[in-house]
């Protein structure tokens, strides 16, 4: 835009269980964009740097291994610590309210993001209320809302890092 920057969420990959793994995510990205882009950046939750009991690699090591062809020295845009929830909530709300030089555009095709941004609620502590629900088929419990909006938060707080830092100080 003339007076600022547009941040556009033009696609999403919200893979259902049992395909909601780092490997399957990378495969889906490669299938859709592998022959159409020269480089990629990745953003996300700081917990992706931690090893799980399921794998010898962290989620981000899997991403780096599988997307190596499209990555360069500056591709990893993840943080070692997540931005504070309340600060990032207020910063994102300021963007939506037009109080910053940034503008967030979410394509209607990003259905999970639209649903998440529409229905996520605030808990009594000012954080995101991560309602737990149980999948009727698998029996697994998961958070109904919050993952898509968290991913947007992490990306925006990193892309707009200097503005976010000033906001937090201010």
Regions found by a protein language model. Give the residues of each.
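Mg2+-dependent endonuclease catalytic cores in nucleic-acid-processing enzymes, primarily RNase H-like
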Residues: 3-137, 162-163, 170
């Amino acid at each position: 835009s003339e007076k600022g920057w547009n941040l556009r969420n033009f696609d999403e990959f919200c893979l259902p269980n049992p395909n909601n793994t780092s490997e399957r995510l990378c495969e889906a990205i490669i299938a859709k964009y592998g022959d159409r882009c020269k480089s990629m950046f990745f953003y996300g939750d700081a917990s992706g740097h931690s090893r799980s009991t399921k794998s010898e690699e962290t989620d981000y090591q899997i991403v780096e291994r599988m997307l190596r062809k499209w990555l360069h020295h500056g591709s990893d845009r993840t943080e070692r610590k997540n931005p504070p929830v309340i600060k990032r909530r207020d910063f994102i709300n300021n963007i939506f309210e037009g109080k910053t030089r940034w503008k967030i555009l979410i394509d209607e095709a990003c259905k999970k993001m639209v649903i998440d941004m529409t229905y996520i609620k605030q808990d009594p502590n000012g954080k995101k209320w991560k309602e737990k629900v149980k999948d009727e088929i698998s029996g697994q419990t998961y958070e109904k809302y919050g993952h898509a909006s968290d991913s947007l938060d992490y990306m925006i707080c990193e892309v707009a890092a200097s503005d976010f830092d000033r906001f937090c100080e201010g």
